[in-house]
C-alpha cells in the first residue's frame, strides 16, 4: 500500500462506521482515474473539436429504433490495453450513496445510456443541453454498445469537463444471471470501447493542439453501474476485480415509466434526496420527461443548498455507504427482473 492509499484508508476509516442505508466503507486507494475524472479537462477542448450547433441536441436523436439483425459483434479490441488494478475485497459491495464529511449538501445526478443488442436507444440532447446551460456536473453510465452506436456523442461527453462516463456493461446484461466469461465480456468490452473512442478523439487535430486538456480525459471509466440494478456476490467480485467501483443509487426518478409526469419525478426526487445522494435517471430514449423534470429540479435543489458533483467527486467527499446486495429501494425488490428479462441482453 502506497502512502497515498494509506491516507485514503485512514480518512475513510475515521469518517464513520454506519449509515441508515448500509455500512460506510473506506475506498482503499481512490486511483488517479477517479481523481481526474471530473472537471479536469479544459472546456477549450470540447469547443475546439465541435461547434455549438454540433453539440446541440436534435429531437429525432432520442427515438429508440430496433436493430436487426441482432448485433452480437464484439468491439474491435476485447479489453483495454492496460490491465486494471483490482480493488480490495472490501470494495466488492454496492455503493448506494456517500456520507459526506460535515454533512455537506452534495448530490450526484447520474444518467444511464443503456442499449441492448437488438436496439439503438438514442440520446436525450435536450437533457444534456440543459445540464450544460445550467453548468450541472453529471455522470453518464454508458453501455459499450451505446458508445459504439453513438460515437460522436460519446466523445463529446468524454471531452466535456462537466461530465464523466461510467461503465454500464456492453449490452445491458443482467449480471445476476450471467456468469464467468459473459460477465467479463460485459465489463471489459465496454472498457475497451471507451478506450477506442478516447484514442480516436485524441488522434484528432483539435485534441493534438491541446495536449494537456486531451491528456486529462480519464484513461478508462472508474465506476460501474449494474444493468437493471441487479447483482450478486459473484458479480460484485468481478466488477471490483476489474478495478471498478460498483455504484447503485438511493434516489429513483422512475423516468422509464411513460405515464409518470415531470412533476411526479420532481416530487419523487425532492422527497428522497439527502446529502450524499446518488440519483438515477436516463439520458436516452428510455427516460420520459427527464429533461422537463430537470428544468425544475436543478433550481429547486440549488435553492435547498445542494451542490451538484460527479460520482467520482462525491466518492472523494466522504465515506461510501455500501451494502452487500443490489436493489432499487429495498432488498429483494428487483428479483422480478430475473424472470422478466433473463440474461437481459436483448
Name every feature range the model reports, one short phrase each:
Residues 17-111, 116-122, 154-155, 297, ...:
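N-terminal pre-catalytic segment of deacetylase/amide-hydrolase enzymes
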Residues 1-3:
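N-terminal hydrophobic targeting signals that begin at the initiator methionine
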Residues 65-176, 182, 188-215, 220-221:
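Active-site beta->alpha N-cap acidic-glycine motif
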Residues 5-16:
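Bacterial N-terminal signal peptides
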Residues 148-152, 170-307, 311-328:
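Catalytic domains of cell-wall/extracellular-matrix polysaccharide-remodeling enzymes
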